[in-house]
């Protein structure tokens, strides 16, 4: 059986891992929702609806209602890769969200994380 890419995986399988990453470091689910909303334009209710649906992680990111134009200010490394140098737009979105959650988990202030 071929392996699924992260884009093909269910949003409901991937997103809770981001929440757990933040919660392990003393941050809240609400803060993960806040950075997700800032980046994608989804409301908390829309995120909850996506979690209850069978939408893929790739579709969740590519169908963002209002992707933040300030997302280009997200820089740094995620998994050893410079976020700002990623050429594939969908992979860049995935890594940008991961970077924001990483910054939360590292204890950065929300005002800093949201640029």
PLM regions and their residue ranges:
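A charge-rich, low-complexity, intrinsically flexible signal that marks solvent-exposed coils, linkers
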Residues: 1-115
């Amino acid at each position: 059986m071929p392996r699924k890419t992260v884009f093909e995986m269910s949003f409901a399988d991937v997103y809770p891992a981001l929440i757990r990453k933040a919660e392990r470091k003393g941050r809240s689910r609400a803060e993960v929702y806040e950075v997700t909303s800032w980046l994608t334009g989804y409301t908390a209710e829309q995120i909850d609806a996506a979690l209850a649906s069978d939408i893929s992680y790739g579709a969740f990111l590519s169908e963002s209602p209002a992707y933040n134009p300030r997302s280009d200010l997200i820089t740094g490394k995620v998994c050893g890769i410079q976020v700002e140098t990623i050429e594939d737009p969908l992979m860049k979105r995935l890594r940008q969200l991961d970077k924001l959650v990483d910054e939360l988990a590292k204890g950065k202030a929300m005002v800093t994380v949201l640029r």
